[in-house]
Amino acid sequence: MYTLTPAAAGRSRRKVIFLGLRGIPEVQGGVETHVAALAVRIAARDWQVEVLGRKPYLPSPEPYVWKGVTVTPVWTPRSKSFEALLHTALGLLVAARRKPDLVHIHAIGPALLTPLARLLGLRVVVTHHGFDYDRQKWGDLAKSVLRAGERMGMSFAHARIGVSKGIVDSVRLRFGVAASFIPNGVETDLPKFGTSYLDYIDVAPRRYVLCVGRIVEEKRQLDLISAFARLNDPDVKLIIVGTADHKGGYLHAVEAAAAATPGVVMTGFQTGEALAQLYQHAGLFVLPSSHEGMPMVLLEALSHGTRCLASDIDANLALDLGADSYYPLGDVAALAAAMRMKLATPDSAADREARAARVMASFGWSPIVDRTIEVYESALVAWKAGGAHRGGTGLKKHLEIGGH
């Protein structure tokens, strides 16, 4: 029977380093939102937590502490093609000097370097956030690299996490390794927010459709703008929140379509209370994506009790919102009709409270943190046992949360 290895000399608490994301806090992205919430809560469980962020995205060029989490900027070029891999490589060299108990790599692109982490003597957990090679923005070479990253991460990590059951099942089937289903979480006990930001952008509560996300091809904002134009309702606006990390043709196309369509407001990236106000007072939230892992923005909208409409991709269907909350991906006419129907249906305070209660019961952070720490402990046991490739003895137990 194996026991956990002692914490590194000179440390009274275990330490985990997060790697593979742009950074925290208030950095655009589902992985970034996930890690920001998770890292703070793990730090509150008496772990030392450090996030190695990408210097161009962080508010300070020097290390800082945010809510008990140390955030360390690591240089990387701001490049669509190379920044994630180069930053991960440099981050692993930093981590090797830090000698943490664990490195937690997020996403399959950065996971390509899991074998390097092993060669550096690091114990590794990898979270699979989605099949990124299905994203429209990537060419054939990038997709091949992402598939290789998935294979390396799943094969060489000491323990693996998938944010959806579909990911976990796929990993088990294709790679023959154990993985634990731990979904994204939502904040509970949200306060009632005012409307100061709504007043600032001149929109009225319940009289707008909201879309939140990075402006990239697979988020399909152009579909939503086209569908909104078909509503032809001057009393309703469309609010698009988000921006692109790298300027390009799709961003310009969305900006042009928004400018040409009356009632469309682009706010850029928002966070904090401004974003919370937009979620809480929306008449309808729409997620028209062609690709998601576990749709964080959809969970956030639901946690505020907001009505939702989403494309019928597997990741969205897994949330089981009801048949009237989905439409066929890419069908602009069907999206417009579904939006019209949703907006015409009364939505009471009781309806919104029930919606929020359901998602909070299934996706609250406390059990997610519990399960993540269990996976960390199993990874340490696997390292001690030398059984990392097949998951080690500590991965025999797979408690599944998420309400399904």
Predicted segments — roles?
Residues 17-19, 198, 202-230, 239:
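Conserved donor-binding/catalytic core segment of Leloir-type glycosyltransferases
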Residues 55-57, 186, 212, 237-252, ...:
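Glycosyltransferase donor-sugar binding loop
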Residues 93, 119, 143-160, 254:
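Membrane-proximal helix-turn-helix segments that form the acceptor-binding/catalytic region
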Residues 251-273:
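Nucleotide-activated donor-binding/catalytic signature segment of Leloir-type glycosyltransferases, i.e.
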Residues 269-270, 277-282:
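Short alpha-helical donor nucleotide-sugar binding micro-motif in glycosyltransferases
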Residues 290:
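Aromatic "clamp/platform" in nucleotide-sugar-dependent glycosyltransferases that forms part
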Residues 303, 307-310:
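Short hydrophobic beta-strand element within catalytic cores of glycosyltransferases
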Residues 324-333, 341-347:
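Conserved acidic donor-binding segment of nucleotide-sugar-dependent glycosyltransferases
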